[in-house]
């Protein structure tokens, strides 16, 4: 960006009357309460999900490690989101009558941008790690079960590299000139930001297709193993593959839905262009933080899937143990059938 363009952006220090009214409105204050509530609920379920993974784990060790890292990453992302929203509301109270102090200079938001977008990209690319984990589990079963932590760490490193590359393409060398309504808004000069969002969406769609196919293969394989194998270890491994693949499918669908909500919503807002005021655009956009919603979905899937699986296991055990009564009755029945 040339110096003239930077100077032009820096000159737009004061919020317009329409934007100023929006940033100090009741709707924006409600948005802060709403997003903060989402974040606080996600904290509770993240704690419950981590406890479930550590105490009542139904996933493989590789999948569990990936999920725990993703949960910890989501804590940072959610905290950044809530901190910026609370700070923006505080600013709207403090400078309600001074529109020239309502906005943030992009250069003052560097730390927030780093935390928000890096953790956001990391959350998105978790679907790649989980999908790859399922593929290795299905096609290289023996290697998978003997090298689970190596596989998980390798996939997390790749996930981190994808995150850093995406952040580099979107923001490296981008001028931080200009002003933004909230500190997590990307700089106006970040022209590659939309391209990276498109790539992220395509990655999630591909991962959903691959994971769905892997889930189908896992179900098919589990049915075959139930017919021909009496090994408890082999049967449990097949059941674990189904449970994990199903959970990953659910998570990717929810993640994709949340991100598409933001992507489609923002694209529609941009298409409307001049037909929509800046204040209305900002108000609607603040209700569309897809990754924040996705970071609530992840612990919900883990926690409730764990509870459901444990309940189903107890039910099956109860059916099996009550089918023939106690051991004495079963032996007596066998003796009678042998006479």
Swiss-Prot record:
**Disulphide connectivity of cysteines:** none
- Keywords for the protein's UniProt record, in alphabetical order: Membrane, Transmembrane, Transmembrane helix
Q: Which residues cross the membrane?
A: 33-53, 110-130, 150-170, 199-219, 250-270, 284-304
A single GO CC term, please? membrane
Membrane topology per the entry is:
Multi-pass membrane protein
Keyword Disulfide bond in record: no
Which top-level group of life is the source organism from?
Eukaryota
Where would you say this protein principally sits, based on its record?
membrane
GO MF, one example: G protein-coupled receptor activity
Give the location in the cell.
Membrane
Keyword Secreted found: no
Cross-referenced InterPro entries: 7TM_GPCR_serpentine_rcpt_Sra (IPR000344)
* Biological-process GO terms, alphabetical: sensory perception of chemical stimulus
> Member of which family?
Belongs to the nematode receptor-like protein sra family.
Matches recorded under PANTHER family: G-PROTEIN COUPLED RECEPTORS FAMILY 1 PROFILE DOMAIN-CONTAINING PROTEIN-RELATED (PTHR31582:SF2), SERPENTINE RECEPTOR, CLASS A (ALPHA)-RELATED-RELATED (PTHR31582)
Q: What is this protein called?
A: Serpentine receptor class alpha-22
The source organism is: Caenorhabditis elegans
């Amino acid at each position: 960006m040339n110096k003239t363009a930077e100077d032009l952006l820096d000159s737009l220090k004061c919020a317009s009357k329409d934007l100023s009214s929006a940033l100090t409105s009741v709707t924006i204050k409600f948005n802060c309460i709403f997003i903060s509530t989402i974040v606080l609920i996600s904290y509770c379920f993240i704690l419950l999900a981590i406890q479930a993974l550590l105490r009542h784990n139904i996933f493989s060790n590789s999948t569990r490690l990936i999920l725990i890292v993703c949960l910890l990453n989501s804590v940072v992302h959610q905290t950044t989101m809530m901190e910026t929203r609370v700070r923006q509301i505080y600013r709207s109270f403090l400078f309600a009558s001074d529109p020239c102090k309502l906005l943030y200079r992009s250069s003052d938001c560097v730390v927030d941008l780093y935390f928000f977008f890096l953790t956001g990209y990391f959350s998105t690319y978790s679907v790649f790690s989980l999908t790859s984990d399922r593929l290795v589990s299905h096609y290289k079963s023996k290697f998978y079960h003997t090298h689970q932590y190596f596989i998980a760490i390798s996939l997390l490193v790749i996930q981190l590299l994808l995150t850093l590359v995406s952040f580099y393409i979107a923001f490296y060398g981008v001028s931080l000139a200009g002003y933004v309504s909230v500190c997590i808004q990307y700089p106006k000069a970040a022209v590659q930001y939309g391209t990276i969002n498109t790539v992220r969406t395509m990655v999630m769609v591909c991962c959903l297709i691959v994971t769905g196919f892997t889930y189908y293969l896992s179900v098919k394989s589990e049915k075959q193993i139930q017919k021909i194998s009496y090994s408890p270890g082999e049967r449990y491994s097949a059941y674990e593959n189904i449970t994990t693949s199903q959970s990953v499918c659910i998570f990717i669908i929810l993640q994709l839905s949340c991100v598409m909500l933001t992507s489609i919503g923002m694209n529609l807002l941009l298409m409307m262009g001049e037909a929509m005021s800046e204040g209305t655009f900002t108000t609607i956009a603040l209700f569309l933080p897809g990754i924040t919603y996705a970071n609530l979905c992840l612990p919900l899937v883990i926690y409730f899937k764990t509870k459901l699986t444990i309940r189903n296991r107890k039910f099956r055990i109860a059916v099996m143990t009550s089918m023939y009564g106690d051991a004495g009755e079963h032996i007596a029945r066998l003796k009678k059938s042998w006479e």
